């Protein structure tokens, strides 16, 4: 910011409280946990810097690399007959590769026109529950494990998580031509990549 350089900041759906969505970029924030509060503080610092910037909120990221839900489900599905997965939290899983591509498009747009500063949302489509996402993973990987729906209350975590992580991404399409990726297509590619590894 001190050098007048534009920058891109990646944030999260956790800045919201999980009330029914999809959430728009300008909707009021209300994080439920420390992670969400620190990400919101990061957003506020970016805006206060005075530099040209884009804040990109995303959620439920998956990839053939690193630790993520898809890789966890593949591991569990290969080892168990049944997997209990939360069915009352919904979101739109985006592939990491699509996020990277969106970031490049946004960074170039901001470089050309610093007036493009703002906050945007990017996630996959269509919306899905964790349990249905797990079923899609089992189907795509041809794993026989059954997915049993459970409520989030039966899967305690150290931090509260939003029940509805859907993000409205229409602003990205209108302003930058960035379309939500279909996670089903990308899931097939990620699983094929992992099987070939």
Label the predicted regions.
Residues 2, 6, 14-56, 60-61:
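Catalytic helix-loop patch of NAD(P)-dependent Rossmann-fold dehydrogenases
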Residues 26, 33, 91-94, 128, ...:
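Residue-level signal for the nucleotide or nucleotide-sugar donor/cofactor binding architecture
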Residues 44-91, 96-98, 104-105:
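NAD(P)-dependent short-chain dehydrogenase/reductase
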Residues 85-90, 120-127, 175:
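Glycine-rich Rossmann NAD(P)(H)-binding loop
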Residues 97-108, 184, 188:
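Amphipathic alpha-helical segments that line or abut small-molecule/effector binding pockets
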Residues 102-103, 109-159:
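Mid/C-terminal beta-alpha module of Rossmann-like enzyme folds, strongest
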Residues 153-175, 180, 190:
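A hydrophobic C-terminal alpha-helical subdomain
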Residues 183-197:
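Amphipathic terminal alpha-helices
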């Amino acid at each position: 910011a001190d050098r007048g350089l534009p920058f891109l900041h990646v944030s999260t759906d956790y800045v919201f409280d999980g009330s029914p969505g999809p959430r728009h970029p300008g909707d009021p924030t209300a994080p439920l946990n420390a992670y969400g509060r620190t990400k919101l503080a990061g957003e506020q610092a970016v805006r206060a810097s005075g530099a040209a910037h884009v804040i990109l909120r995303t959620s439920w990221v998956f990839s053939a690399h690193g630790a993520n839900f898809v890789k966890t489900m593949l591991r569990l599905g290969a080892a168990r007959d049944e997997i209990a997965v939360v069915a009352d939290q919904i979101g739109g899983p985006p592939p990491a590769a699509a996020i990277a591509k969106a970031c490049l498009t946004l960074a170039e747009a901001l470089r050309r026109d610093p007036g493009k500063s703002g906050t945007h949302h990017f996630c996959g489509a269509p919306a899905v529950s964790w349990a249905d996402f797990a079923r899609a993973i089992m189907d795509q990987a041809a794993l026989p494990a059954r997915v049993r729906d459970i409520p989030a209350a039966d899967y305690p975590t150290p931090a509260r998580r939003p029940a509805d992580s859907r993000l409205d991404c229409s602003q990205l399409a209108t302003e930058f031509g960035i379309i939500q990726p279909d996670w089903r297509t990308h899931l097939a590619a990620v699983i094929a990549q992992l099987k070939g590894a």
